Amino acid sequence: MSDKQSFTREEYLADVRGANGTRAQWFALMLEEAEKAGIDLDKFCEDTIYEFGLGRCKKYGVCEGNPGKMAEMLYGSNGQDVFEMELAEKTDERGVLKFHFCPLAHTWKAMGLPAERVAELCRLACYSDFARADCAGVNLHFENQIGRGDEICELVFTPRKDGDPSGAEACRVDCAQKDGE
């Protein structure tokens, strides 16, 4: 007799989204305590979340600095269904992914956190995404983010040019540009 279990697609998605939600909860609580201790959250997340992203991106070199390849690779990942991804554009000059669901933002909102805190947690969690873009040799900009109150997350990948900021720098700049609108 086999101990192997089978799950429906819906059960699998619920479990994976639940795991992402648990991660979102401890991330929020951890940063709350770090803030109480006087730790600079950007520096802390750059040193941890950005490093986490770098550790996960070994396969991203196959993108060869091509934004469309980066978008396509992420679209083909296990996260496609979890984040309800849409591959909106795939060219050598631009790759665009749209996420129609974010289990992290969903959890932070369900925790009753204020909109400003959800937006800040979202931005800090994105250090990982910017690290992955660095590994792929492309730039990343978030045109929209569910955590900022937008309907979707829209990740826009463009070619990296000499003098472009690192992903960590881009994470801070991306937020400042959105806040300045």
Q: Which role does the model predict for each range below?
A:
Residues 1-123, 128, 139-153, 158-181:
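N-terminal accessory segment detector
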